[in-house]
Swiss-Prot record:
CDD domains: HTH_XRE
Protein name (record): Multiprotein-bridging factor 1
Lineage per the UniProt record: Eukaryota, Fungi, Dikarya, Ascomycota, Taphrinomycotina
GO terms of biological process kind: maintenance of translational fidelity; positive regulation of transcription by RNA polymerase II
Keyword hit for Thylakoid: no
PANTHER family: ENDOTHELIAL DIFFERENTIATION-RELATED FACTOR 1 (PTHR10245:SF15), ENDOTHELIAL DIFFERENTIATION-RELATED FACTOR 1 MULTIPROTEIN BRIDGING FACTOR 1 (PTHR10245)
Start and end residues of each HTH cro/C1-type domain: 82-136
DNA-binding annotation, residue ranges on this chain: 93-112
Keywords assigned: Activator, DNA-binding, Transcription, Transcription regulation
C-alpha cells in the first residue's frame, strides 16, 4: 500500500485507545486499576515557587501574638516628685518648661504620670529642679560633684 491510498485525518489522535487522564484522587487511581488501564504514579516536585519569605513568617508570628503591650509610662512617684520640686522653687509648669527648653504639654504629661519616659527630658528636669527622678531614691536631692 502506498502513501497515496492512506487517508490523513487532521486533529485525530495517533494510535488507538482513550486519551491519557490524570487521576487526582486515590479512588480514581483504584478504579483505573480495576478497569485494567495502564497506571503510572509519579509525584510532582514543583520547587520553583516554594521559596519562603522570612519577613512574611515574622509578620505572621507578630499577628498571632494577641497581646498588645502599651508603652510604659512614668510612675506616680516621679509625677509627685516633679510637682513637689517645682512648687518648692515656686515655678509654674510654664516656667519649668522654659528652663528645660520643652513644651508646657511635656511637663504636664510628666506631672500627670502619662508620659513615656525620655532620659534626656528627665535629666533636664533633674538638673533644673535639683532632685532625682530616675533610679532609686526618687525625690531625693541631687548630690553635687564628687569631692576628690
Amino acid at each position: 500500500m502506498s502513501d497515496w491510498d492512506t487517508v490523513t485525518k487532521i486533529g485525530s489522535r495517533a494510535g488507538p485507545g482513550a486519551r491519557t487522564h490524570v487521576a487526582k484522587t486515590q479512588s480514581q487511581i483504584n478504579s483505573a486499576r480495576r478497569a485494567g488501564a495502564i497506571v503510572g504514579t509519579e509525584k510532582k516536585y514543583a520547587t520553583g515557587n516554594k521559596s519562603q519569605d522570612p519577613a512574611g513568617q515574622h509578620l505572621t508570628k507578630i499577628d498571632r501574638e494577641n497581646e498588645v503591650k502599651p508603652p510604659s509610662t512614668t510612675g506616680r512617684s516621679v509625677a509627685q516628685a516633679i510637682q513637689k520640686g517645682r512648687q518648692a522653687k515656686g515655678w509654674a509648669q510654664k516656667d519649668l518648661s522654659q528652663r528645660i527648653n520643652e513644651k508646657p504639654q511635656v511637663v504636664n504629661d510628666y506631672e500627670s504620670g502619662r508620659a513615656i519616659p525620655n532620659q534626656q527630658v528627665l535629666s533636664k528636669m533633674e538638673r533644673a529642679l535639683g532632685i532625682k527622678l530616675r533610679g532609686q531614691n526618687i525625690g531625693a536631692p541631687l548630690g553635687g560633684p564628687k569631692k576628690k
